[in-house]
Amino acid sequence: EGLPGRKRSSLRRWAIEDKVIMGYTSPDKKFYHTDAFTDYAIDRLDEYKDEDKPFVLYLPYTAPHYPLHAWPEDIAKYRGKYKIGWDKIREQRFKRMNEMGIIGPNHKLTPSASKAWDDLTVQQKEDEDLKMAVYAAMIDRVDQNLGRLFTKVKELGEWDNSLIIFLTDNGAGPEQPNTTPDIPPGPVESYRTVSVGWANASNTPYRKFKSTDYEGGIRTPFIAHWPGVIKPGMTNQVGHIIDVSATFRDITGAKYPKKILGNKTKPPLGKSLLPIFHGQEREPHKEIYWHFSRANAVRQGDLKVVRAGKAWELYDLKADPTEMNNLAEA
């Protein structure tokens, strides 16, 4: 069985306990990915609760990736909250991010990448409000389940002894595989996504989206919690996903294997985040690279070159963090 309302050359599969099951979702009407993932995570914590050595729990929720599916009670919390539109929400978020110190005076709000909200019809605005309500409901369910997980960690007496990292892999995406246009987002029968306007608002104040190497595609949230080690606050030091493994090895004393399945490994590229967690200045990466399809970028210090299948562009991210002034054209 393929995806609902979508023609594919291959079938989609899901698996539980190493058993591959055909079909795009569970036949259980009460099944929801985020809930199920958390159930299994809690079971794993119970399984390893008596271990003396450190453990790592990797919990990769699929939410809020499309398709937009959420429980009705979660959707109801957010219905109507997005009718002011993506333009005003971008402005509000930009203002609040400045007030919170998340961004600074050099950050400029990039031009809108979508149709103006005021140009939509009343029905279109209603439809867009529902899309974002479902998207928010999916994130709400993530929050609920993280609460369940954290409660379990506390019950095991490991809260003060645990480093918790919460992050996402990329910026919001503009993809539009809305293959069930006659079915509103929310139920399992639908296959809908958020619009470009909402993806643009999600990436405030940066340019572009997922699948590009502009800041809107690669600059993502990273939250770390470790009682007694990490003090509340924010840092502007640059990190990368490759640093996570290096950090875990630094904390636990684990060694990177020289061979895996008989094959020699290459030296890992990540740098431990532990100095940053301790409030210290970490020696930065000499350079960081990104590549996805036709998108490429290299960052050295504050300078970044980036392209999307065309000519290279150059930006000074300290003076121009939202990539508004292409120095290659100067």
Describe each PLM feature range.
Residues 1-75, 79, 84, 98, ...:
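Formylglycine-dependent
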